[in-house]
Structures are given as structure tokens and as C-alpha cells.
Amino acid sequence: MRESVHTNTSIWSKGMMSVIAAQFLSAFGDNALLFATLALLKAQFYPDWSQPILQMVFVGAYILFAPFVGQVADSFAKGRVMMFANGLKLLGAASICFGFNPFVGYTLVGIGAAAYSPAKYGILGELTTGDKLVKANGLMEASTIAAILLGSVAGGVLADWHVIAALVACALAYAGAVVANLFIPKLAAARPGQSWHLRKMVRSFFCACISLWRNGETRFSLVGTSLFWGAGVTLRFLLVLWVPVALGITDNATPTYLNAMVAIGIVVGAGAAAKLVTLETVARCMPAGILIGVVVLIFSLQHALLPAYALLTLIGVLGGFFVVPLNALLQERGKKSVGAGNAIAVQNLGENSAMLLMLGLYSLAVLVGIPVVAIGIGFGGLFALAIAALWIWQRRQM
């Protein structure tokens, strides 16, 4: 990894482009692996309710390691942390390729992802600052969503052809991410010399949680992003069961195409947010959050492919516009109070706790036999109400 002692505030710097390239390949692998592993579960006749369990073991790793990964990201050069994390993802994908239990392999990928996330977002605040950070987040989200778009489709299409080939492609993507990490400049550790005593680390993490929760802006950001990503991952699994029921299509590729429409929309929404929203005008994103739930409700009632594509694209546009400013707000305020790595680790705890809760409720709803269309309607309505309540709460705190 190359040595560097200076940060470059341009969002088009060589260091930033290396981060974006590594993120693209890592996210490509994450999304292709999800759909390839779902295809593997289907081929091995696992029950439908086990599908969200796969994601639950992934997010469980985030929650379990949340007290530690923020300090890891702030105690070492973040580029090296990203490289180590991608190596863990590579190991997990390779283990599934070689026939190990897919839930165990996917848990390894989850551990790698847990370590990766605080570093990948925390490094943005070290490479650029101020309102450029919103633009850098937009670039990161656009890269991530492009990877979701291509990775999801690649995972589904390759799995329809050959499941093992799809899994190998995922492992190669992670290997490419490790190589890209080598070109990220080595920046000084943000907070070196912290205690590695486990009890102190847990106490320090929960002190960071309390600090961020007591601040009105960071509390608002934490709740908003947690609701968004919890809903987003649940929508992914909802589509897997919704497609054969509503559209009568039973392949692996169609749900990935529909997920790709959301990804395309998020790229557009993230770009719009970077241009129209600053750290001082974050509240502009809230109407978009409410509309996400409304459009999900309308989408659940569709029975044709074309309107489904259009509505999912709109959901993505609204989602990108909603989440990018909230991410930037948390990074900027969190960097000044508890460190960027710890701020993102706390955010991950909130987001993944929301994912675990929503996926658990979704899995339970499927297990007890609630029709998938009814699940979608209830899910959309509750999300719209939750974001509306958050907006009212935030305005009363001002």
C-alpha cells in the first residue's frame, strides 16, 4: 500500500478513485453472492423461510462485532482495514464454492463486511471535507448502487446457467477488491493508541452510542438510515417471493432485474441529493422517505412487469435522495465527536439491528402463511408512517 501523509480534498483524487474502485468490486461480490447463494439454497431444497435467515446471519455479524470494528477502523490505516476485510469476504465466498455450509460461509462474509463498512465510509472524511463530503458520499453510493445493479443481475443470470460459476465470479470480485485496496494511500490512523481491552472497548463503543444519541442531528440520522436500510434489505427478499406470485415468473434472474431497477433509481437520487441538499438543508430529504413507503404499497398491487420496473425505479430515486444526506450528516458530526470509524460502527449497529428485526418479522410472516402481497402492503404503509413520525419528531426537537 502506498505511503501518503497528505489528504487531497478533491473528490476525483487518485486515492478517492482507488476507494471507489475497491468499493465497487466488494459490493459487486456482496450482491452477486447473495443471489448466487439464494439459488444454491433453492437448488438444495431449503424452505422459503430460510432465505431471510441467510441475510440474518450476515447482519448478525455486524451487530456482534459493532463494539470493535469502529476502533479497528480508527486505529489503523483505513485502506489496510478494507484490504483485510475483503480478504475475509474472499475466504467466505471460497468456502461456499468448495461445498462448505452456505450459512457458515456467508457469516464469514458478514464478518468481513462488518469490518469493512466503518473503514470505507470513514476514509471519505479523511480524503475530503465539508460539502464535498456530500458529493463524495454521492459518488460512493453511485458506485455501490452500480455494483448492486451489475452484481445482482450477474448473480441471478449466472446462477440460472451454473450456480458454482456464479459463486466463483463472486470470489474473483473479492480478489479484485483486495488488489484495488493496494492503491489506496496509507493515511495516518485517526485515533491511534486506544486500549484493546475488550471490556474497555465495549464501554467505549456504548459511550459513543450515547454521545451520538444525545445529539439531535446524529440521532435523527441514525434513526433515518436504520429505517431505510432495514426496509431496503427486506424489500429484496420480498421480491424473491413476490415475482412468482404476482408475475408468474419462477427464474432466478427476474428478481435481480427488479432489484437492478431500484439500484438505477438510487444512482439518480444520490446524484440529485448531492446537488440539491447540503448539511444545513438535510430535512429536504424527508418527503422522499415518506413517499418510499407509499410507492412500495402501490407496487405490491401490480401484476405486470412494466409498471413494476417503473415503480421500483421510482423507489430507488426516492431512496437515494433520502439516505445520502443522512449519511453525510452523520459522518461530518460524528467525526468531530467520536471519530468517523466509531460513528459508522454505531450507524451499522442501528441499521443492522433494524434489518434483523424487519427480516425476522418478514420470515415469521412467511412462515405463518401471510400472502406476500399483503406483506408488501403492510410493509409499505408502516414504513411511510415511521418516516412521517421521524420527521415530526425531528421538527419538534428543533
Curated annotation (Swiss-Prot):
Q: Does the keyword Cell membrane apply?
A: yes
* Superkingdom classification of source: Bacteria
InterPro entries in the record, alphabetically? LysoPLipid__transptr_LplT, MFS, MFS_trans_sf
Among its keywords, does the record have Electron transport?
no
Topology relative to the membrane: Multi-pass membrane protein
Keyword terms, alphabetized: Cell inner membrane, Cell membrane, Lipid transport, Membrane, Transmembrane, Transmembrane helix, Transport
Q: What is this protein called?
A: Lysophospholipid transporter LplT
